[in-house]
Amino acid sequence: MKLAQFRILLLIATLVVAVDQLTKGLIVRCLKLHEALPVVPNFFDLVYVRNKGAAFGILANTEYRVPFFIITTSVAVVFLAWFYRQYRPDQVLGRCAVSLVLGGAIGNLIDRVRFGEVVDFLDVHWYQYHWPAFNVADSAICVGVGMLLLAQWRDGIRHQA
């Protein structure tokens, strides 16, 4: 595969990593740990928290969590690069989806290597009912997975027709 075929991957993943790290850096500089800044009252705050675990704090208190997350994320990054190669150049949705997931994985990997945990700052809630805080990398992963499912479904329908 030629380098030109990796343009989408490099562009989107780099953009996700850059925006993720920039926003996390701003939050760390502008807010104190656990400080919240209401943006939309009773619905959305910017908050500075750190997550030692995976999604929803899973494995946060595991002894070897940092090496575990660094190794599993590194393996995922290699797998995603391989998976990207499986898409034909005309399968743009799938390529964009994998690129988003890869960028998000790298963004959170950078935090794990630097801090041993991930900086989260987006807090969506309904009054006192909070969804766990997340970040740009998490958002890219979720959107990318959704797009990946859509791409797989769409490709499945095309093969049946």
UniProtKB/Swiss-Prot annotation:
Q: Which InterPro entries match?
A: Peptidase_A8
Q: Which reaction does it catalyse?
A: Release of signal peptides from bacterial membrane prolipoproteins. Hydrolyzes -Xaa-Yaa-Zaa-|-(S,diacylglyceryl)Cys-, in which Xaa is hydrophobic (preferably Leu), and Yaa (Ala or Ser) and Zaa (Gly or Ala) have small, neutral side chains
Q: Which UniProt keywords apply?
A: Aspartyl protease, Cell inner membrane, Cell membrane, Hydrolase, Membrane, Protease, Transmembrane, Transmembrane helix
Molecular-function annotations in GO: aspartic-type endopeptidase activity
Q: How does it sit in the bilayer?
A: Multi-pass membrane protein
This protein's GO CC annotations: plasma membrane
Q: In which pathway does it act?
A: Protein modification; lipoprotein biosynthesis (signal peptide cleavage)
Where in the cell is the protein located?
Cell inner membrane
Q: Where is the active site?
A: 120, 138
- Which EC number(s) does the record attach to this protein? 3.4.23.36
Primary localization: membrane
Describe the function of this protein: This protein specifically catalyzes the removal of signal peptides from prolipoproteins.
Q: Which family does it belong to?
A: Belongs to the peptidase A8 family.
Q: What is this protein called?
A: Lipoprotein signal peptidase
